[in-house]
Regions:
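HhH-family (HhH-GPD) DNA N-glycosylase catalytic core used in base-excision repair
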Residues: 1-194
Length: 194
């Protein structure tokens, strides 16, 4: 399924101005910067049980609240900082999600130390090359794959939280490890075929 807006054919989930901008500029674009990868990992975890539109609306607030997703700073958050975040109505005030952000920052730094970068680590799950799918409709797109299962298992082993396979697959889609734009979407070809 696709949606048309200004004669461009898009994936059908891009329905409002915010999601259209995200779809057209970010979703599925191969991402290699560690801070950007960390941002998406945290946002995908925050989205668990909520709509992605909710997270997109709060994204700027998350950047401000979480020191622009600087993992070194977040890894040093203490109980008082977590309490402060729990009182911040501009973000999702879920104690487990906020605590996992701190834990994920610590685990992220360890991965950077071990692999040289989080980018080098995370792209190994697709053999360092974007996987390009050929879906004709959103109904065909899976919620998880063997690659997201493997990523989830390894991230959990390394101490990350809120990284179930479905969250990992959404992360893979967001940062372009996979191109899951439907084939009729103008972004499918614009991003490339791997």
């Amino acid at each position: 399924m696709t949606s048309k807006s200004s004669t461009l054919v898009r994936c059908a989930w891009a329905r409002n101005q915010l999601s259209i901008r995200y779809h057209d500029k970010e979703w599925g674009v191969p991402t290699h910067g560690d801070r950007r990868l960390f941002e998406f990992l945290i946002l995908e975890g925050a989205q668990a049980g909520l709509s992605w539109d909710t997270i997109l609306r709060k994204r700027a607030n998350y950047r401000a609240a979480f020191d622009h997703f600087d993992p070194k700073r977040i890894a040093r958050y203490d109980r008082r900082k977590i309490q402060s975040l729990l009182g911040n109505s501009s973000i999702i005030r879920n104690r487990l999600k906020i605590a996992s952000t701190v834990q994920n920052a610590k685990a992220f730094l360890k991965v950077q130390d071990e692999f040289g970068s989080f980018d080098r680590y995370i792209w190994q799950f697709v053999d360092r090359k974007q996987r390009v799918n050929s879906w004709r409709s959103l109904k065909q797109i899976p919620a998880r794959t063997p690659q997201s299962d493997a990523m989830s298992k390894d991230l959990k082993k390394r101490g990350f939280g809120f990284v179930g396979s479905t969250i990992c697959y959404a992360f893979m889609q967001a940062v372009g490890l996979v191109n899951d734009h439907v084939v009729d979407c103008f972004r499918y070809s614009a991003i490339g075929r791997g």
